[in-house]
Each structure stands twice: as structure tokens, then as C-alpha cells.
Amino acid sequence: FDAQGRYIEFAKNTFPKGMTLDGLKVVVDCGHGAAYRVATTVLRELGATVFATGVNPDGTNINLDCGSTVPEHMCKIVCEARADVGIALDGDADRVIIADEQGKLLDGDQLMALIAEQMHNRGQLKGGGLVATHMSNLGLEQHLDSLGLHLSRTRIGDRYVMEYMRKHGYNLGGEQSGHIIMADHTTTGDGLVAALKILSLLAESEKPASEVCRVFTPLPQVLRNVAYTRGDLLEQAEIRECIVAAQRQLGKRGRLLVRRSGTEEKIRIMAEGENESLIRDVVENVAGAIEQQAG
């Protein structure tokens, strides 16, 4: 049973028939993880000139200073090799982050926007938009709205994105962190398949990645974590009133998300909007109220 060989053929079959990556210089960082053989093989068989890194797993070095969680390593190689594009996968290869030819990063929001627009133009996008989480940038939502598409949001986690997609008939979804779910091909995030979609658009356009892949300007986003050790602070009246006041202050100019971490004893506060000074004030006010009650 040749699992690697079958996956290589599956991945290549998601790439447009008759198209190649001839002449494209691609850096791929496999994070010393699951895709360390298959990603480089697929890219080379499609014709790309491949500069590979993160392809020497030893059982302990997965994601160590490499891959999509530390994409700066990949960006550096893109610039040194004068590559056309860089791809960083995480250890289990379900996430992808892209770098343009200047070594500048493109997160999952940018990739989803690009894929959605292309699928929409070709009549392939189902559900009238895409599914993402509450962490996706408001700029993505505004960009989709300008195309007559909508963004449906779920709680954080690619499993919740997929559940919503199945329930409501979408075929594209994902997370800002680089999980991209293309339900016509897979039922979970597949970093290589998503990367191949982006590479096909690059090959088709014959333009630099910086022009093709940066489709909207993200709005400023401010994140703050507040540690706590007791009780459900977000249910306290003083904090709820502060959050409501902050949301009223932002109005339609921004968005505020306050939630408990699912993995740590922390409350995460995120605000975004066109006025960075305003959103910083909002985050500091909410964080201050939480810290006062937590103290």
C-alpha cells in the first residue's frame, strides 16, 4: 500500500490539467513534518524549481524554528534564492502560509480571498461566500462584500468551520492561521492542495506574487491577553458593561472580540478597525477592567 504515492497523485490531480509550474522558483518549508517528501515531489513533478527546507525530520524537530509557525525562515530563503514564491507548511501539513517574491507574508485571510474571487468568477463557489472564524480580519469581510459575497463566521477551530460548511452548503472555508478547506477536494485543511491552488493562479497570471496574492488591505488588529485564575470573569456585570460600552464606541467602524482561551487561563481581547488609535484605546479599556476584577 503506497500511501505517499497515492497522495502525490491525488494532490497533482487537484492542479489544472495541461498547466505546469515550469519556470517558477518555489521555496517550500515542510517543518520537518508530514509533507517532507510529498510536497517537494509534487512541486518538482509539476515542473517547479524547488528550494526545500525543513525536510530532515528526526522525530523531535517537527516545527522547530521552521514551518508555518515560524515562516520567517522560509521568507529569508525566498529573498536569498530570488524565488518567485515561498510556501511554509506546518508539521501535519494542514496549514499553509505563503510569502511573495519580496519575502512578505500572506496569511490565510489573503489566500481565502484570492481563492474565493477566482472560484466565484468561474462559477465554482458554493454558498455565496466562504466560512471563516471570528479571528479573520474585517478587511476580508469588506472585500468579499465588495464582490457581492458574504463571510460567515464560526467559533475558532477548523472543525467548526467544516461543520458550518457542511451544514450550509459552502465549499470554501478556513482560518487566518492558514487552515484552508476546499471541500471539492478534501474535508479538512490541506496545506499543499491550497498552495497548489495559489501556484496555479500565479502560473496563469504570469505576474509577481506580490501583485496576484495581496487582494485586500487588512485593517489594523490589536490583540491582548489577560491572565486569570478564578471564576468566570466575563459573566461579571462590570466587565459585561465595559464590553458593551466598547462595542458602542467602535460602532460600525470596527469589531471587538472578547473570549476565554480554550487552552490557557487567559482572556483574549481582539479589536480591529480603520482607526488604530481607537481600537488600541478600546482594547486597553477592556483589558484594564478585566485586570481590575482578576486582581
Segments (PLM) and residue ranges:
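Gly/Ser/Thr-enriched, mixed-charge loops and adjacent short helices
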Residues: 1-81
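Predominant activation on well-ordered alpha-helical scaffold segments within soluble catalytic domains
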Residues: 9-12, 37-44, 72-75, 79, ...
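Glycine- and other small-residue-rich loops at beta-strand/loop junctions that grip anionic moieties
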Residues: 28-31, 63, 105-108, 128-133, ...
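Short, glycine/acidic-enriched loop or turn micro-motifs at the edges of active sites
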Residues: 32, 91-95, 103, 178, ...
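Short hydrophobic/aromatic-enriched beta-strand-loop microsegments
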Residues: 47-54, 105-110, 148-156
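Short, charged, surface-exposed secondary-structure boundary motifs
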Residues: 60-65, 117, 161-165
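Phosphate-binding and adjacent anionic-ligand microenvironments
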Residues: 84-85, 122-295
